[in-house]
């Protein structure tokens, strides 16, 4: 235990007060889990869920031809092993991908014209190659064409229904207009909106609007049905001339009594003009009152909710939705109508908007409505009923065209309170209903038809028996769920009671069970039409078909649309709430898997069209599946997605933090998302639901602010794509350690306490009132009302922000800069983990994948700079094939940002390692912790103006000690192609070049490793054939002397570009298969092969040793059952003697198998078993390594036309210099202004100089006080380290040393470990602590002021952290004391070397003839209008003339100047700038006749 502490640097003094409840989930799980779900590659074929790739195949297949005589069905897919591993893909510029094979089945049907029954004629099954699919590496990235890329997760609007209003901005009256929008995952959008006259309109796909009732009528609803669906009605009785109305308790509470209302005894219960209350209504009902008197005034002007019919003649007296006038009332009295129904609309609680919409809608029947919709969507096409029906059906009810998705259905049901379950699809299949269910069929159907409405019993019986018979014929895959049958019951009842029936044309297209056809016949013939004026066909009763027959519930259905309209009307009436689009319950994350799934679907749909055409054109019977399938469209779509999608990004590999953050990024941009220009303020803003899900701090500055966010530390994404955050459950004021994840919707309405709320030992809240969050507000609630509690204070922020100590003391804007700048820190030569950290450093380093983590428990067997060999513990043997783990470390490899990736071992031979331990550090990691910068002694004081405006004064000591030196690796590539004129050749034999230029090239023309190179040096010599030209006499002479070679080739060697100076650290040669290898290639191959052989030998050796140990344990001490001979036949041990260790050592291992033992059971069998297993393992290892060697010797796959490709890697050492950008972790950034000699820096009274001087004025206005607290705490940490150093120098006793360390840490767990340490371990720990005691000050629970002061005192410093400094130049003390301390300072990727460049001549722009701009174009420095004024002000007329003519765009002047310099004349003859000619041409193009007249006049 102690050893692992000393070894693994677990020594941070932590200031956290809240104990760790739950570990932070793996930081890159968002990527890995998503892709794992998508591929399901490790799931057996028959257990794969219908998600990801599997779901795409199942949704597109089966593919039928147009005549439906054949169909292509999907069976399964399998992935093979990738051709190249990750490392090879990097080097060769390949994509890391696995070949995919899909098993498909081609079924050919017999048309069955004679028999009338369709039968299967032929079935062919085959595996078809389906292109390659990129695989994710262990670190959550993809390798596409040799570069590492990340697919960023997209944050988009969730499918579902959204209700909103225009905030009164649309109409001049300022009236609030409500609207609803149904957004599917894919398919047509449906919008409902009110206009200022309160008429409800609908738009399909944002086309022209029409009354919403047109859509409802097209769904097959009658006017009467709709009115009664959205409005309640009151029954009016006419008895003996008196008007009375029935008691409807719901409606009465909204009304006043017109006259006194009395019971049968005449006791007045409600007086006139008084409101009805719940109590008074209950009293009326208790007294047996069923109707109350009303006046004719109160009912005149209201509308009929159903047709009122003359009881004698059957004539309609009052139509549905017709207004009741005084004349009509009199007519009803005359015709002796006793009762009729009126709609209840009071204009306050129930508005007439829907009734007005019905009135405004001039369409009377369902058919007209369908045709009207067709006209709106396809203006110009002549509509027919059939085409209108087909179009409407495809809009919302066809699963191929319209997909709400499981999430959309979930959101819709959640919002509208519907009960359509995402899992209630019943598929046709071979299995029958179970016997028990068949017995219950009668009973089932009886219960099915027990409805609320009256039904003819005879009809019910007929229906029942018929349904039972046909249920027996139904071949349902699974039993019909109860809830489904209940739903079917309601539908059937309403169908029977309203005498609505299905029309045949709808059914014809569907293969319905017989029972439904029979049902419809019965309903149609049920004799219910005698009392109806007309039967309105219920064309769209899709719900019944859908739920009973098992279509996808991920389509829209009639009920949804009715309910959406109902909710919208309720909103209008002041009930319900609108949705907040920025709420994280309304936004969801599409991670890699889902993004790729969508692309794959696009590709498969394209492929489907092609297959259908092929099936129709060719004779299918003679074809196999592979003749029909061409997977090119699918591969092309996938390739395009990974190569050029907006969300597929070049991985930011500057340092481990930038990698992790890039993989955890959430972007609102991208296809199907927002655009920068359109996104307003609200979308970008922080929302209460972001708490614990999305970081409020980390987002880019600039146009993308708020659109790109980062996942919070503990957040994860659930299967629906919503971001979840963990909370501890609280029961009756008691905090439990049970943790549950909540999405933003689930957390709504809960009272959530902060993580730092005070609790006692038992987890009960100490304070009576606790500060909590509830529905996005901060509230004080009683402790018993708290339901949840945060798990940790850092739950709020992202990984980068959680790495900033004292974040709580920084202004948010600066914290944002701090978290963004940490991602730009360059990995330094010597990583140094921060003295003041937050405790997150280890987690980031481990999850980023840059350091090497032990895969098993074991013992380190061998270590060198390039590899670690670990012998695995025996109890872990079964998992791995062999007992050895070999870790080949990455050495000086180039990252995407040209920084250096280098791994260094941190273990030594004999160390015990546990699974999950860090055994090698990567870039920017120090003993398994993230280390982006250096701990520097800083002083806050002005110094000679060198820290004006955030400049930084740096001591030369830092460059001398290479504290800020970084290595950058550039890759240069040279390609030899086969040209029309002949082959290019890579060679050292280059014409017209001296010995000096070629001194570092080997005979193959490639530079040697270790060569120092500067701009213009040749890296790879290459010659290209020249076209045949007329030869000059000189060339003819050269040809005659030197033969052909010199004349017909030109030098096209790869040279170093300007601004690059470094050391060659590697070269790789790739040659086409079949070409002869040059000496360099053979050398490289030999080195690689030696490495492989060494690995092989180590594995075999360790396995042999392990087997030898096992055999010795079996044999030593046993009695020989027969004499033992060596291979020469000499007896080495007589029978009956004990076997010893020495004896076994004298024999070869294969002779051990021949030893027979007299005591101990089955020893010989065990020995044989161990030896046979050993031989198997050795064979296996040798096989694997032979394959690798074969692969190495094979030629390479190069692009067409390429013969050979050489890559050269140059390492550039960048020291810190003036102009480099540096920053702290608190957004305090600056540029190095001067590197001052060590002796001139301000120094302390003990002679120690400070290393960096910062401007104190950079703190107050920026409000990032965190940097000051960090400086103080760092100073205390360093001071304590110096004290320990002093104790070590003075050889203090072990006890005193332990005591000091124990008091410093003040941690019970650490004290236990300290007590178990022996002297050696203690000294190791003390030596490490002497550099400074590392502290962890986690965000929002960091060290307080009192704690820092206490530590400063303990370290022997003043509590204000200030020191007297002396001027290094004069030795005088500065007047005031200065704040000095340790700050963690980073060097950022904006290096001056990458920006500075010089040009004298270079490329010019084609049109203006002015020099190009920028370093990449080797351009010049622009001299603008204001610079010209400055030159004029100085009076530098000649210099200015030169700038504006010969140095810019005076073409003839340039050549004259060149000639003048060559001839030694120093005169300037400027000509006419080219831009003048351009101006003239521009004016001429505007038809202005402008010309320049030259001459004397």
UniProtKB/Swiss-Prot annotation:
Query: According to the lineage, what is the superkingdom?
Result: Bacteria
Give, as one word, the top-level EC class: transferase
Decide whether keyword Oxidoreductase is in the record. Answer: no
What EC number(s) would the UniProt record show?
2.7.7.6
The keyword Mitochondrion appears for this protein: no
An individual GO BP term:
DNA-templated transcription
GO terms assigned for molecular function? DNA binding; DNA-directed RNA polymerase activity; ribonucleoside binding
- CDD domains under this entry? RNA_pol_B_RPB2
Q: Name one Pfam family in it.
A: RNA_pol_Rpb2_45
Q: Which SUPFAM superfamilies match?
A: beta and beta-prime subunits of DNA dependent RNA-polymerase (SSF64484)
Classification via Gene3D superfamilies:
2.40.50.100, 2.40.50.150, 3.90.1100.10, DNA-directed RNA polymerase, beta subunit, external 1 domain (2.30.150.10), DNA-directed RNA polymerase, subunit 2, domain 6 (2.40.270.10), RNA polymerase alpha subunit dimerisation domain (3.90.1800.10), RNA polymerase Rpb2, domain 2 (3.90.1110.10)
Q: Keywords in UniProt for this one?
A: DNA-directed RNA polymerase, Nucleotidyltransferase, Transcription, Transferase
Which terms in the GO cellular component ontology are assigned? DNA-directed RNA polymerase complex
| InterPro entries xref list | DNA-dir_RNA_pol_bsu_ext_1_sf (IPR042107), DNA-dir_RNA_pol_bsu_external_1 (IPR019462), DNA-dir_RNA_pol_su2 (IPR015712), DNA-dir_RNAP_su2_dom (IPR007120), DNA-dir_RNAP_su2_hyb_sf (IPR037033), RNA_pol_bsu_bac (IPR010243), RNA_pol_bsu_CS (IPR007121), RNA_pol_bsu_protrusion (IPR007644)
Question: Coiled-coil annotation: which residues?
Answer: none
- What reaction does this enzyme carry out catalytically? RNA(n) + a ribonucleoside 5'-triphosphate = RNA(n+1) + diphosphate
Q: What does this protein do?
A: DNA-dependent RNA polymerase catalyzes the transcription of DNA into RNA using the four ribonucleoside triphosphates as substrates.
What is stated as this protein's family in its record?
Belongs to the RNA polymerase beta chain family.
Q: What is this protein called?
A: DNA-directed RNA polymerase subunit beta
- Recorded source organism is Trichlorobacter lovleyi (strain ATCC BAA-1151 / DSM 17278 / SZ) (Geobacter lovleyi)
**Lineage of producing organism:** Bacteria, Pseudomonadati, Thermodesulfobacteriota, Desulfuromonadia, Geobacterales
């Amino acid at each position: 235990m102690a050893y692992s502490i000393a070894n693994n640097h677990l020594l941070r003094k932590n200031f956290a007060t809240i104990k760790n409840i739950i570990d932070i989930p793996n930081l890159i799980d968002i990527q890995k889990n998503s892709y794992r779900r998508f591929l399901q590659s490790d799931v057996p074929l028959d257990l794969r869920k219908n998600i990801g790739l599997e779901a795409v195949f199942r949704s597109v297949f089966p593919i039928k031809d147009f005549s439906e005589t054949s169909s292509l069905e999907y069976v399964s897919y399998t992935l093979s092993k990738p051709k190249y591993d990750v490392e090879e893909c990097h080097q060769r510029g390949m994509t890391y991908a696995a070949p995919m094979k899909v098993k498909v089945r081609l079924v050919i049907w017999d048309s069955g014209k004679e028999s009338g029954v369709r039968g299967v004629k032929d079935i062919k099954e085959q595996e078809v190659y389906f292109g390659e699919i990129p695989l994710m590496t262990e670190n959550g990235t993809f390798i596409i064409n040799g570069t590492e890329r990340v697919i960023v997760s997209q944050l988009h609007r969730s499918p579902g229904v959204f209700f909103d209003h225009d905030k009164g901005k649309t109409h001049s009256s300022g009236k609030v207009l409500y609207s609803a929008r149904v957004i599917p995952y894919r398919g047509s959008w449906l919008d409902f909106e009110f206009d200022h006259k309160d008429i409800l309109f609908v738009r399909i796909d944002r086309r022209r609007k029409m009354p919403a009732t047109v859509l409802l009528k097209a769904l097959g609803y009658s006017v009467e049905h709709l009115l009664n669906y959205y409005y309640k009605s009151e029954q009016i009785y006419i008895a003996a001339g008196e008007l009375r109305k029935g008691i409807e308790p719901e409606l009465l509470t909204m009304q006043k009594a017109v006259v006194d209302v009395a019971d049968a005894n005449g006791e007045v219960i409600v007086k006139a003009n008084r409101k009805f209350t719940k109590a008074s209504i209950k009293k009326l009902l208790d007294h047996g009152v069923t109707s109350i008197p009303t006046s004719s005034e109160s009912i005149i002007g209201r509308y009929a909710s159903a047709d009122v019919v003359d009881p004698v003649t059957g004539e309609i007296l009052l139509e549905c939705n017709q207004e009741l006038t005084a004349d009509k009332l009199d007519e009803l009295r005359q015709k002796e109508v006793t009762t009729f129904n009126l709609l209840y609309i009071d204009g306050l609680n129930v508005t007439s908007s829907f009734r007005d919409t019905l009135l405004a809608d001039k369409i009377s029947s369902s058919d007209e409505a369908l045709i009207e919709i067709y006209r709106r969507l396809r203006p110009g096409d002549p509509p027919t009923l059939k085409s209108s029906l087909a179009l409407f059906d495809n809009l919302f009810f066809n699963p191929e065209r319209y997909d709400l998705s499981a999430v959309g259905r979930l959101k819709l049901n959640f919002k509208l309170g519907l009960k359509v379950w995402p899992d209630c699809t019943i598929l046709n299949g071979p299995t029958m209903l179970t016997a028990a269910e068949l017995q219950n069929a009668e009973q089932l159907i009886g219960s099915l038809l027990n409805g609320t409405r009256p039904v003819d019993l005879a009809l019910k019986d007929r229906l029942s028996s018929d349904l039972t018979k046909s249920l027996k014929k139904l071949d349902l895959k699974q039993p019909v769920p109860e809830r489904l049958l209940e739903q079917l019951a309601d539908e059937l009842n309403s169908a029977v009671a309203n005498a609505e029936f299905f029309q045949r044309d709808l059914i014809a297209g569907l293969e319905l069970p017989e029972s439904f056809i029979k049902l419809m016949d019965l309903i149609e013939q049920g004799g219910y039409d005698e009392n109806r004026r007309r039967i309105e066909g219920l064309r769209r009763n899709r719900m019944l078909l859908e739920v009973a027959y098992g279509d996808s519930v991920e389509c829209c259905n009639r009920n949804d649309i009715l309910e959406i309209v109902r909710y919208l009307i309720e909103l209008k009436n002041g009930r319900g709430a609108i949705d907040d689009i920025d709420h994280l319950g309304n936004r969801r994350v599409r991670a890699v898997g889902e993004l790729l799934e969508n692309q794959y679907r696009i590709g498969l749909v394209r492929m489907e069209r092609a297959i259908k055409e092929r099936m129709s054109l060719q004779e299918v019977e003679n074809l196999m599946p592979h003749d029909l399938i061409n997977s090119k469209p699918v591969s092309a779509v996938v390739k395009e997605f990974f190569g050029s999608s907006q969300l597929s990004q070049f991985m930011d590999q500057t340092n481990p933090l930038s990698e992790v953050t890039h993989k955890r990024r959430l972007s609102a941009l991208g296809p199907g998302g927002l655009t920068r220009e359109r996104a307003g303020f609200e979308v970008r803003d922080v929302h209460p639901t972001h708490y614990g899900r999305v970081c409020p701090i980390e987002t880019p500055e600039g146009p993308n602010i708020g659109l790109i966010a980062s996942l919070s530390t503990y957040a994860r994404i659930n299967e629906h794509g919503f971001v979840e955050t963990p909370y501890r459950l609280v029961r009756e004021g008691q905090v439990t350690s049970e943790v549950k994840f909540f999405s933003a919707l689930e957390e709504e309405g809960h009272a959530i306490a902060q993580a730092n709320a005070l609790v006692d030992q038992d987890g009960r809240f100490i304070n009576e009132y606790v500060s909590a969050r509830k529905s996005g507000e901060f509230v004080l609630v009683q402790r018993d009302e708290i339901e949840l509690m945060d798990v940790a204070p850092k739950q709020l922020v992202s990984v980068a922000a959680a790495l900033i100590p004292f974040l709580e003391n920084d202004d948010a804007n600066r914290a944002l800069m701090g978290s963004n700048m940490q991602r730009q820190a360059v990995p330094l030569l010597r990583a140094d983990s921060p003295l003041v950290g937050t405790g997150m450093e280890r987690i980031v380093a481990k999850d980023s994948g840059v350091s090497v983590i032990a895969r098993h428990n074991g013992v380190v067997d061998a270590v060198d700079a390039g590899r670690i060999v670990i012998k695995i513990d025996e109890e872990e043997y079964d998992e791995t094939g062999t007992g050895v783990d070999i870790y080949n470390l990455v050495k000086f490899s180039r990252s995407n940002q040209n920084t250096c990736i280098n791994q260094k071992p941190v273990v030594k031979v004999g160390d015990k390692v546990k699974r999950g331990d860090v055994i090698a550090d990567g870039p920017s990691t120090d003993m398994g912790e993230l280390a982006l910068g250096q701990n520097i002694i800083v002083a806050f004081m002005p110094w000679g103006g060198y820290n004006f405006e955030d400049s930084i004064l740096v001591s030369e000591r830092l460059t001398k000690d290479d504290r800020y030196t970084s290595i950058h690796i550039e890759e240069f590539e040279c390609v030899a192609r086969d040209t029309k004129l002949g082959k290019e050749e890579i060679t050292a034999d280059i014409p017209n070049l001296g010995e000096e230029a070629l001194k570092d090239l080997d005979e193959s023309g490639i530079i040697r490793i270790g060569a120092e190179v500067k701009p213009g040096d040749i890296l790879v010599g290459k010659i290209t054939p020249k076209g045949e030209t007329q030869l000059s006499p000189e060339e003819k002479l050269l040809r005659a002397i030197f033969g052909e070679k010199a004349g017909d080739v030109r030098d096209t060697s790869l040279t170093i570009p300007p601004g690059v100076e470094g050391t060659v650290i590697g070269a790789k040669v790739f040659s086409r298969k079949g070409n002869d290898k040059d000496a360099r290639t053979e050398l490289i191959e030999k080195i690689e092969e030696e490495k492989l052989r060494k690995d092989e030998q180590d594995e075999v050796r360790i396995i042999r040793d392990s087997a030898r140990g096992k055999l010795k344990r079996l044999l030593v001490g046993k009695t020989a059952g027969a004499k033992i001979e060596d291979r020469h036949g000499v007896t080495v041990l007589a029978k009956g003697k004990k076997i010893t260790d020495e004896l076994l050592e004298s024999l070869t291992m294969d002779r051990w198998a021949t030893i027979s033992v007299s005591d101990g059971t089955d020893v010989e069998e065990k020995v044989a078993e161990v030896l046979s297993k050993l031989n198997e393992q050795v064979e296996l290892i040798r096989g694997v390594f032979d394959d690798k060697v074969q692969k190495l010797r094979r030629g390479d796959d190069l692009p067409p036309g390429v013969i050979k490709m050489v890559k050269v890697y140059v390492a550039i050492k960048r020291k810190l210099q003036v102009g480099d950008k540096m920053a702290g972790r608190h957004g305090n950034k600056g540029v190095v202004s001067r590197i001052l000699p060590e002796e001139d820096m301000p120094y302390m009274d003990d002679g120690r100089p400070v290393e960096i001087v910062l401007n104190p004025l950079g703190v107050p206005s920026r409000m990032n006080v965190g940097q000051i607290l960090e400086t103080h705490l760092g100073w205390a940490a360093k001071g304590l380290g110096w004290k320990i150093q002093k104790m070590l120098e003075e050889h203090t006793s072990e006890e005193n040393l332990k005591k000091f360390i124990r008091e410093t840490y003040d941690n019970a767990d650490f004290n236990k470990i300290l007590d178990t340490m022996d002297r050696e371990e203690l000294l190791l720990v003390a030596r490490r602590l002497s550099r400074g005691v590392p502290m962890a000050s986690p965000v929002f629970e960091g060290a307080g002021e009192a704690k820092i002061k206490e530590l400063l005192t303990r370290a022997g410093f003043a509590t204000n952290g200030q020191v007297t400094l002396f001027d290094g130049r004069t030795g005088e003390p500065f007047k005031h004391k200065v704040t000095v301390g340790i700050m963690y300072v980073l060097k950022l990727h904006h290096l001056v070397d990458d920006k500075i460049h010089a040009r004298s001549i270079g490329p010019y722009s084609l049109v203006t003839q002015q020099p190009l701009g920028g370093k990449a174009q080797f351009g010049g420095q622009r001299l603008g209008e204001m610079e010209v004024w400055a030159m004029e002000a100085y009076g530098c007329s000649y210099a200015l003339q030169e700038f504006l003519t010969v140095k810019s765009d005076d073409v003839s002047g340039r050549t004259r100047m060149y000639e003048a310099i060559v001839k030694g004349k120093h005169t300037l003859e400027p000509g006419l700038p080219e831009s003048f000619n351009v101006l003239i041409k521009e004016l001429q193009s505007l038809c202005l006749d402008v010309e320049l007249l030259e001459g004397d006049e």
